Amino acid sequence: MTSIGWDAFAGCSGLTSVTIPNSVTSIGDYAFDGCSGLTSVTIGNSVKSIGDYAFRRCSALTSVTIPNSVTSIGGRAFELCSGLTSVTIGSGVTSIGTEAFSDCRKILDVYCYAEKVPYTESGVFICLPIENATLHVPDASIDRYKVTAPWRSFGKIVALTEDETGIDELKGENGKVKTALYDLSGRRVQKGQKGVFIQNGKVMVR
């Protein structure tokens, strides 16, 4: 499986955890829209694009890490993720769509590793108290972020510290404890089979 399609898991309120493997390159529009019970999302380091409304209304998410492989974040991709307090944006992101993080009113920290300030469409951080949040960016780029909308509106803009060295990549099977996989009907599946599976009570796409 190389992509998660349009509306694939929309409205699955019982979904609590998602791991998107390194084989997936795109997350479609509305893919996880309205998954209100989703508390954990791990995005593999081959994903290049996150579609419009992809994670909208995932109100239980408290943090999200967008890996360095991603170049574009779609419009309203994380709109109304009311529990988000921390967002990490990888170094490869070049564009962020309209109102991508609108109404995420609890955001306190945004860590952006892009040395070139990403292009943003209108209202990326609209309807949240951005003046109370801190933007963490590469030291060499801090002056550019300070003069570019909407980034300049953050209450604090600081350099990433030495401890914030980068984004951990999703490890393959060699870095994981082996566990059994089951399909959505409860049948155990063979190693290497592609699809959407349940592993340790969590949904996994591969």
Model-derived features: positions:
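Residue-level detector of functionally pivotal "anchor" positions at catalytic/ligand-binding pockets or at interdomain
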Residues: 161-185
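C-terminal tail/sorting-segment detector
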Residues: 196-206
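Consensus positions within tandem repeat domains that build extended binding/scaffold surfaces
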Residues: 5-10, 28-33, 51-56, 74-79, ...
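Structural signature of tandem-repeat unit edges
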Residues: 1-3, 13-26, 36-49, 59-72, ...
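A recurrent domain-boundary module in secreted/ectodomain proteins
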Residues: 147-165
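A structural signal for leucine-rich repeat
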Residues: 123-128, 152
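Generic structural signal for well-ordered beta-strand positions
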Residues: 189-190
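Short hydrophobic/aromatic-rich beta-strand motifs
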Residues: 133-136, 181, 197-198
